[in-house]
């Protein structure tokens, strides 16, 4: 097993580790135990006798010089040039050359007008690799990281990061492809993006095959199908060919076959394109560029398994989430020649180009819930990551079952995770509860938590939330009259992490271990960490608030990009792409010099510090980034950034209760108290993941005063208004402590820490009242709307909003951990509790 440490506890002990092993050799459950192994020195590695004695330990070898990197991975050898163009020059498996080149492909489309006519100019860019790094090197696996961009006539566009994962004696290569958009949205439309491989093909043309997965079964053809009129090829020969057998005709059969192949078309090129979530097409053509394509097959969805081969061997391809992240595809070209080309299209040029422009030339602040009335949309700096794999095979074409199994393994790779009980015992990611069914109310709460997750699992499919730039995200708010999410209404459209559905889903997985919840959270993670945030440019380290377009809102904030959204997936999987993102975030407080999150609320000339940060969600998001950098590298500089802010908050009149608006100096990370003001509402201080970050930090810092401040915050939030004014001596003024169900985690923490039974009761009352009133226990009950939403029977929750669902579920998960014992035992007691609810001084959810 190949292992590495990914995080440390403050005392230097190991917190998280990442491991690589051959899952095919392991059972469904494994136990990982620490063991100290002697490492061979470089001098020993050069000693043949030492090598022989330790041959079982010396596994994968990486040789490097100025011109190339050579990987010796048992039966697999890879030559990687350092010339800046190709990912590799040759891949040999079991002594046979399978691939001779691989390089990034980019097509951009530019709209133009000529003599009053609208034109589209398609431009193909060449790749330029600027850096090749051996990112991970171990006994079982090597990861090669390529960084570069594309060029045309001196113009550089669309940076990329490509990772190639190579395993010992493995016939499979895994790729993680990331591109960043740095184009001009008015003229740089994405027309095609992928990686093109060159593979030698040999032998008779009738022994060359292609296969594509369909909706049902496998589409399979030979380049020269031995089905003829005159002379007629024997049926058994054609039947053997369609089974994928190597044909070696003899005698009269050979004469007939050789005669017919002189007078038939050879299908030199095959193309498959999934152009929507509900349609794909397979086409083919002969080599002549002046000839048309023939339609082979139209279908609904393909999982993306594909292969082609010859007597040389075959290549299998599988692009993960093939139809979900449309438009995707493959083009296999020159199959009847000596060197075939196989392009894996992450964005297929057979589909319409991606238009990155905004939907309007202004913002709609009040009416459509957008950040401001001015336009602030920009796609410059967003990214997208895709994953695909290829496998080398000695067969002329793999079997249908092999393609299915390979594709299934790419879509759902084997991952080992701990049990919920194990993670809970070690307080992984702070405070959260395990499911329990000890009484009627607990059963009802667990039922609602499951209903909520199940609803969104189904809603992704029902609402077609698919496509490269959309897949993974949810919509924000529902329109019950149109029976549709408000996809066209400014800030009500795509959610973009608003009120942290990310944390809800990850904690839901942590406590249940449900595989489907893991996948739902994983897709949300991959989208929100890439498309919703900026990885370069003036907004690097910030994300865009919820909008019709993922990059549409003029509000660019740290909370959308914060590491807290992504730490779960990183520590559970060791995903290397997230390491890039964490490095982007570690010092992203400097982005506050470019974009003051409260810049439109305060006069610049009256400020002492150059920017602002609310204690939550702005400063708390920075804390998540700093905490991640601290625990990954034991870099106490980032711990100190956190404590600087904590000490500043301690000096405020009401400590954590104060503000939450502060002036902020990104260079010193100091906060300056400027009074009791809450731009956007006090609830924003605690509904964007702040409680979860603060609670986890509280145990890492061992600062008792900080814990007391958190507890006091939860207590104060639920005080009657007159008591709030009295305790604060009136300095809170008109500041509302609104939407109290969103503060339930803080209230529960306070009740637990202070042993305050009255606070525990108030916390449960507000949290339960937000979903139960007047004896109605329907919760997340779905209803059927016939003939709506282009469905025979539309399943909906007419009042639903992702904001409410995410916050209610997240708070329930945390509150149960702290004050489960104060939960009413049955729903009749719950009804009595919520009937006593006093709403004066609070804004209803």
Language-model segments: what does each one mean?
Residues 170, 175-176, 378-392, 494-522, ...:
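Conserved beta-strand->loop/alpha-helix structural units within folded catalytic cores of enzymes
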Residues 72-418, 471-477, 493-496, 530-531, ...:
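Beta-strand/loop-rich accessory regions of lumenal/periplasmic or secreted enzymes
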């Amino acid at each position: 097993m190949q292992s590495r440490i990914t995080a440390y506890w403050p005392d230097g002990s190991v917190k998280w580790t990442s491991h690589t092993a051959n899952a095919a050799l392991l059972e469904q459950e494994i136990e990982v135990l620490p063991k100290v192994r002697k490492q061979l020195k470089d001098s020993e590695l050069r000693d043949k006798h030492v090598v022989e004695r330790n041959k079982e330990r010396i596994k994968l070898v990486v040789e490097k010089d100025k011109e190339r990197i050579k990987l010796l991975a048992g039966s697999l050898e890879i030559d990687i040039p350092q010339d800046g163009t190709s990912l590799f020059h040759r891949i040999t498996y079991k002594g046979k050359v399978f691939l001779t080149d691989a390089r990034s492909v980019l097509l951009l489309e530019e709209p133009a007008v000529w003599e009053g006519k609208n034109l589209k100019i398609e431009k193909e860019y060449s790749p330029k690799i600027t850096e090749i790094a051996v990112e991970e090197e171990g006994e079982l696996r090597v990861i090669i990281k390529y960084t570069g961009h594309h060029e045309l006539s001196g113009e550089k566009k669309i940076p990329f990061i490509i990772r190639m994962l190579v395993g010992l004696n493995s016939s499979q290569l895994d790729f993680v492809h990331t591109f960043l958009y740095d184009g001009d949205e008015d003229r740089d439309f994405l027309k095609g993006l992928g990686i093109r491989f060159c593979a030698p093909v040999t032998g008779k043309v009738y022994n060359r095959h292609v296969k594509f997965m369909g909706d049902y079964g496998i589409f399979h053809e030979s380049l020269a199908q031995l089905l003829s009129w005159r002379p007629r090829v024997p049926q058994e020969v054609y039947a053997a060919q369609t089974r994928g057998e190597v044909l070696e005709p003899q005698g009269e059969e050979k004469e007939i076959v050789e005669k017919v192949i002189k007078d038939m078309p050879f299908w030199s090129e095959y193309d498959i394109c999934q152009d929507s979530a509900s349609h794909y097409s397979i086409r083919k053509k002969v080599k002549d560029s002046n000839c048309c394509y023939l339609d082979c097959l139209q279908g609904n969805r393909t999982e993306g398994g594909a292969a082609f081969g010859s007597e040389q061997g075959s290549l299998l391809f599988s692009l993960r989430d093939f139809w979900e992240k449309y438009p995707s595809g493959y083009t296999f070209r020159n199959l009847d020649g000596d060197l075939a080309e196989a392009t894996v299209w992450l964005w297929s040029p057979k589909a319409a180009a991606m238009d990155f422009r905004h939907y309007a030339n202004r913002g709609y602040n009040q009416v459509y819930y957008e950040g401001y009335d001015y336009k602030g949309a920009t796609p410059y700096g967003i990214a997208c990551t895709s994953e695909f794999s290829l496998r080398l095979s000695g067969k002329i074409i793999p079997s249908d079952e092999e393609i299915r199994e390979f594709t299934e393994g790419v879509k759902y790779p084997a991952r080992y995770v701990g049990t919920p009980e194990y993670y809970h015992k070690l307080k992984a990611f702070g405070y959260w509860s395990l499911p329990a069914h000890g009484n009627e109310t607990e059963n009802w709460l667990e039922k609602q938590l499951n209903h909520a997750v199940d609803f969104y699992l189904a809603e992704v499919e029902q609402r077609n939330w698919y496509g490269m730039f959309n897949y993974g995200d949810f919509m924000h708010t529902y329109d019950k009259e149109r029976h549709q999410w408000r996809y066209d209404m400014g800030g009500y459209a795509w959610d973009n992490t608003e009120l942290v559905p990310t944390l809800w889903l990850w904690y839901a997985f942590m406590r249940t271990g449900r595989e489907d919840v893991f996948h739902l959270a994983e897709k949300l993670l991959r989208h929100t960490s890439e498309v919703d945030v900026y990885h370069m440019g003036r907004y690097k380290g910030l994300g865009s608030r919820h909008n019709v377009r993922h990059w549409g809102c003029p509000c660019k904030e740290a909370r959308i990009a914060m590491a807290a959204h992504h730490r779960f997936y990183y520590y559970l999987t060791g995903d290397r792409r997230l390491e890039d993102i964490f490095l982007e975030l570690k010092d992203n407080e400097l982005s506050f010099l470019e974009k003051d999150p409260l810049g439109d609320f305060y006069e610049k000339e009256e400020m002492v510090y150059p920017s602002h940060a609310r204690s939550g969600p702005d400063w708390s998001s920075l804390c998540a980034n700093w905490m991640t950098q601290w625990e990954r590298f034991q870099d106490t500089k980032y711990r100190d950034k956190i404590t600087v802010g904590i000490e500043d908050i301690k000096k405020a009149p009401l400590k954590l209760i104060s503000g939450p608006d502060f002036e902020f100096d990104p260079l010193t990370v100091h906060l300056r108290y400027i009074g009791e003001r809450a731009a956007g509402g006090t609830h924003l201080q605690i509904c964007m993941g702040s409680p979860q970050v603060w609670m986890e930090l509280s145990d890492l810092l061992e600062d008792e005063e900080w814990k007391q401040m958190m507890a006091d915050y939860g207590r104060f939030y639920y005080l009657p208004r007159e008591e709030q004014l009295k305790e604060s001596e009136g300095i809170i003024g008109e500041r509302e402590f609104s939407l109290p169900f969103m503060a339930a985690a803080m209230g529960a923490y306070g009740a637990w820490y202070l042993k305050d039974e009255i606070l525990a009761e108030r916390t449960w009352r507000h949290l339960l009242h937000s979903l139960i009133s007047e004896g109605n226990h329907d919760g997340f009950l779905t209803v059927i709307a016939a003939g709506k939403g282009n469905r025979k029977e539309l399943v909906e929750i007419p009042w639903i909003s992702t904001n409410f669902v995410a916050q209610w579920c997240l708070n329930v998960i945390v509150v149960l951990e702290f004050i489960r014992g104060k939960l009413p035992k049955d729903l009749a007691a719950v009804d009595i509790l919520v009937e006593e609810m006093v709403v004066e001084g609070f804004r209803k959810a």
